[in-house]
């Protein structure tokens, strides 16, 4: 017997003896005082004493049992926490090597795809939520380091797009911002062109091609370096730089937002290749205009179907009162591409008193079946070094987990939903799926390139063996004729050029045309088809529509009172002021300054659109193997000669059209026809001198919507006071608005008559005449050089074929490794399911299969360790749904079958 047990026995014996003695003393006293007390009463007293003794004994035993249970529970909690901590530590070391292998592998695949012009999209996450829901802290946890953006309100005014690039050589984060042009921005701008809705290689939204055109994904080899700042920004200066860029675009008042994103490129050895969008927070109250602008901006960001939405809500907000989730549901009704995350869980977990209350909360209310949210807490401390930040995240997670264990929550049921590590693992799995979804199509495209290269080699060899001047002349004339016809078809409207490949959105057109932007234009009008990839006549017509919006948005320039006073001179025959003459002079000068530059820009943009058709037409004709004359497209020197004549023709009509337009502008402004203006009812008079951007926007929309409004009479005055100044300026502004309206219509007509029509009527004869008049010597010079070019091209094609086959085999090797890993995981899954039914519902394989069928579920709760090929990759037939998720049939592909690619 232990010392404690002996002591307890002694206490019980002592207490029992004391109680018995007390009762005995009382009884003896009673007997002595009452001789009539019988033995039955004595027995009752003894029984009562024994009962009291037993009750006291039970209480002591209950206290001891409770104390033992608490000690056992505490020991179990400590053991589980230590196991969880060890699991986290082990996963860090394992993932450090396995993920690095994966990143390196997919970097190679992305570079191969880039070299062969194959689409290989970088996955994208869009983080949305209310203000103070912890969006920036969540992003920091994915990045692995803090940059203190959460201490400011800058995230509420401009989207921040972080392009994470895995770079093994960067053991510390390397951060660079994308260059920005603030020349057309001003503090009062509420928004700008819709540059934030789009995706990589998704043609309905290609204007925001951050993965390719803006430089994201796949390592720095794919980046257009001149779009990024030459210098790196230290991590501790990121916040200051983001604030500066935000204020430059939206002003310092804090009451404006801009849809133009800030791009931040982060190269780091310990991150995935991923684009993350940090969005302005939804507003619950305050300025209704600001709430609406933010809501619309975020909707545009989450609309692209390829983007994964991370919807954050604070854990202390009741399920029925959530705001972000209903807004996201409007865009993603079944949450098929949405991850639900409840932040600041540490504020909620301390309110959970028992197992039942914990389970009720963790199950969630009003959420689609099988859609389980994550619950995370993140460190509150700021300015932590990278390794301390990781340790703080670990301790924060373990603290939440400890509190849940203490109230006995079901680990098997809810463990996979707790902590940032489960979210990160889940996101990693999704990234692997996205990469794998790219793998098979890329492999098929590589095989197609191999076959095309083999066919090109055959064509070049045949052309080299059959080459003489007479034959080449005939081929050239047929090719030129077909080329002219193809240009006409592209202008009239045709999809033969593949808009997905050759089309441009309005943003892409502006970025690639090398033409200066519209001066002083900073509005987000709904330009027709601006988000669609167009070429030819459709792209030209979109430009004219944009031009009308631009010219109507031009306001009468600020005019000083000195200018007005100087413009009111004297007549040859009298000294009476002529206000109409003063207003006319001011109007003529200001109109030339504001409107004339637009002529140059619209003509240069028109020429750019027409010049693009050369490459499109040559590509179409070169793919037509049924026409033997199209083999002349193999001769680079001939194509350069043809392109030279084609662009010479465009430059000629551009010059002629510019001359006519400027002459017409002089005609319109030289002599003012007041009767013409007085009959104009489309323009409603307004204060031409003080116009806000919002008023300009509404006025342009009303004009473009053809609303009929009233006119205004002229007025006179003699004194050069403020009233006279206002009247003269209003007259000049009235003249300006009239010319602005009529001239926009005139330019459209002139462009169609003197720029577009010659492309139909004169281009064919111009190019045909040129080549028909070339002498034999010129042909010999042109095609003798072409023979050397063909020989060089043959060598390049042969080398390309070798390289392409090597890369194709590399893709096959990756695929086989994934398939092998899948089989191993399936075997492990089968084994574990026989031991535990609950764990089989949460393993990684089933999670992936559910995700690929459009449902995201909870990641594996039993392990944070993930090999680089945990995700399954099966049957090649992709069935694309409306939400752009992919179903994959379950039988594995045998790509090693020699006839596989022939069958597909």
From Swiss-Prot:
- Please give the biological process terms from Gene Ontology that the record holds: mitotic cytokinesis
Q: Where is the composition biased (Polar residues)?
A: 853-876
- What SMART domains does the database record attribute to this sequence? DYNc
Record region (G2 motif): 155-157
Keyword Coiled coil appears in the UniProt entry: yes
EC id: 3.6.5.5
Q: Where is this region: G3 motif?
A: 278-281
Composition bias of kind Low complexity appears in: 183-213, 877-891
* Region annotated G5 motif, chain positions: 378-381
Q: Could you tell me what reaction this enzyme catalyses? A: GTP + H2O = GDP + phosphate + H(+)
State the residue spans of region: G4 motif: 343-346
Per UniProt, the ranges with Basic and acidic residues bias are 67-90
Region (Disordered), start-end ranges: 53-93, 169-227, 821-840, 853-904
InterPro entries associated with the record: Dynamin (IPR022812), Dynamin_GTPase (IPR001401), Dynamin_N (IPR045063), G_DYNAMIN_dom (IPR030381), P-loop_NTPase (IPR027417)
User: Residues in domain Dynamin-type G?
Assistant: 119-441
The knockout note for this entry states: Produced cells are larger and a large amount of them contained more than two nuclei.
Q: Which GO terms describe its molecular function?
A: GTP binding; GTPase activity; microtubule binding
Region spans: G1 motif: 129-136
Q: Where does GTP bind?
A: 129-136, 278-282, 343-346
Q: Which Pfam families match?
A: Dynamin_N
Its keywords, alphabetically, are: Cell cycle, Cell division, Coiled coil, Cytoplasm, GTP-binding, Hydrolase, Motor protein, Nucleotide-binding
Point out the coiled-coil segments of this chain. 44-102, 781-811
Asked if the keyword Chaperone belongs to this entry, the reply reads no
Q: Where in the cell is it found?
A: Cytoplasm
Q: Which family does it belong to?
A: Belongs to the TRAFAC class dynamin-like GTPase superfamily. Dynamin/Fzo/YdjA family.
Q: What is this protein called?
A: Dynamin-like protein C
């Amino acid at each position: 017997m232990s010392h404690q047990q002996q002591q307890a026995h002694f206490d019980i014996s002592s207490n029992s003896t004391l109680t018995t003695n007390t009762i005995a003393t009382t009884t003896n006293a009673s007997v002595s005082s009452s001789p009539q007390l019988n033995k039955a009463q004595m027995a009752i007293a003894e029984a009562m004493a024994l009962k009291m003794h037993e009750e006291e004994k039970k209480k002591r035993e209950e206290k001891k049992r409770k104390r033992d249970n608490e000690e056992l529970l505490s020991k179990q909690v400590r053991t589980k926490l230590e196991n969880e901590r060890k699991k986290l530590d082990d996963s860090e070391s394992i993932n450090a090597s396995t993920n690095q292998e994966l990143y390196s592998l997919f970097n190679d695949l992305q570079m191969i795809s880039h070299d062969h012009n194959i689409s290989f999209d970088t996955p994208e996450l869009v983080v949305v939520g209310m203000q103070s829901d912890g969006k920036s802290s969540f992003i920091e946890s994915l990045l692995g380091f803090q940059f203190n953006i959460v201490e400011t309100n800058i995230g509420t005014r401009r989207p921040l797009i972080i392009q994470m690039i895995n770079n093994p050589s960067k053991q510390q984060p390397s951060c660079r911002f994308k260059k920005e042009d603030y020349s057309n921005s001003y503090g009062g701008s509420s928004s700008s062109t819709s540059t934030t809705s789009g995706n990589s290689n998704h043609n309905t939204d290609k204007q925001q091609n951050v993965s390719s055109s803006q430089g994201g994904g796949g390592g720095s080899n794919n980046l257009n370096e001149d779009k990024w700042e030459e210098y790196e920004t230290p991590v501790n200066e990121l916040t200051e730089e983001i604030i500066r860029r935000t204020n430059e675009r939206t002003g310092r008042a804090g009451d404006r937002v801009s849809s133009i994103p800030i791009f931040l490129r982060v190269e780091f050895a310990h991150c995935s290749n991923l684009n993350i969008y940090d969005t302005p927070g939804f507003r619950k109250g305050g300025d209704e205009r600001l709430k609406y602008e933010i809501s619309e901006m975020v909707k545009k960001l989450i609309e692209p179907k390829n983007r994964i939405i991370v919807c954050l809500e604070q854990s202390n907000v009741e399920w029925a009162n959530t705001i972000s989730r209903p807004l996201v549901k409007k865009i993603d009704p079944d949450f098929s591409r949405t991850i639900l995350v409840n932040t600041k869980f540490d504020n909620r977990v301390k309110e959970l008193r028992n197992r039942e209350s914990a389970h009720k909360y963790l199950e969630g209310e009003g959420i689609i079946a099988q859609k389980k949210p994550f619950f995370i807490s993140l460190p509150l401390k700021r300015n932590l070094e990278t390794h301390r930040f990781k340790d703080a995240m670990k301790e924060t997670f373990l603290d939440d987990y400890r509190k849940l264990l203490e109230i006995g929550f079901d680990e098997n049921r809810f463990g996979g939903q707790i902590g940032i590590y489960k979210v990160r693992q889940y996101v990693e799995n999704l990234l692997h799926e996205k990469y794998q979804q790219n793998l098979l199509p890329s492999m098929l495209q590589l095989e197609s390139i191999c076959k095309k290269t083999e066919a090109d080699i055959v064509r070049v060899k045949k052309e080299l063996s059959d080459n003489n001047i007479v034959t080449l002349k005939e081929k050239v004339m047929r090719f030129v004729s077909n080329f002219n016809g193809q240009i006409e078809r592209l202008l009239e409207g045709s999809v033969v050029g593949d808009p997905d490949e050759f089309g441009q959105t309005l943003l892409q057109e502006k970025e690639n045309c090398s033409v200066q932007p519209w001066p002083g234009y900073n509005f987000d009008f709904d330009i027709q088809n601006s988000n669609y990839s167009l070429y030819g006549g459709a792209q030209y017509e979109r430009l004219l529509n944009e031009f009308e919006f631009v010219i109507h948005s031009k306001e009468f320039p600020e005019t000083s009172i000195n200018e007005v006073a100087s413009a009111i001179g004297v007549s040859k025959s009298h000294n009476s002021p002529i206000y109409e003459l003063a207003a006319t002079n001011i109007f003529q000068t200001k109109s030339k300054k504001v409107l004339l530059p637009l002529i140059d820009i619209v003509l240069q943009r028109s020429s750019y659109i027409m010049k693009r058709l050369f490459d499109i037409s040559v590509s179409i004709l070169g793919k037509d193997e049924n026409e033997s004359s199209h083999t002349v497209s193999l001769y680079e020197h001939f194509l350069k000669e043809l392109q030279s004549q084609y662009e010479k023709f465009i430059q000629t009509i551009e010059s002629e059209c510019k001359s006519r337009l400027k002459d017409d502008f002089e005609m319109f402004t030289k002599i003012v026809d007041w009767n013409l203006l007085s009959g104009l009812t489309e323009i409603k008079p307004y204060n031409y001198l003080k116009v806000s951007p919002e008023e300009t926007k509404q006025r342009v929309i009303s004009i473009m919507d053809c609303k009929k409004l009233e006119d205004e009479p002229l007025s006179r005055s003699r004194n050069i006071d403020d009233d006279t100044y206002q009247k003269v300026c209003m007259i000049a502004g009235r003249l300006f608005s009239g010319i602005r309206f009529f001239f926009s219509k005139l330019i459209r007509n002139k462009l169609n008559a003197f720029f577009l029509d010659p492309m139909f009527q004169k281009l064919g004869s111009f190019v045909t005449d040129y080549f028909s008049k070339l002498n034999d010597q010129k042909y010999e010079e042109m095609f003798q050089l072409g023979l050397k070019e063909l020989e060089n091209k043959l060598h390049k094609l042969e080398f390309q074929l070798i390289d392409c086959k090597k890369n194709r085999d590399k893709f096959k090797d990756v695929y086989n490794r994934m398939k092998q890993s899948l089989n191993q995981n399936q075997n492990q899954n089968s084994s574990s399911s026989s031991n535990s039914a609950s764990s089989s519902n949460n393993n990684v394989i089933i999670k992936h299969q559910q995700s690929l069928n459009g449902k995201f579920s909870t990641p594996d709760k039993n392990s944070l360790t993930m090999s680089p090929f945990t995700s399954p990759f099966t049957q090649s037939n992709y069935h694309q749904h409306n939400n752009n998720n992919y179903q994959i049939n379950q039988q594995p592909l045998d790509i090693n079958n020699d006839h596989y690619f022939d069958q597909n």
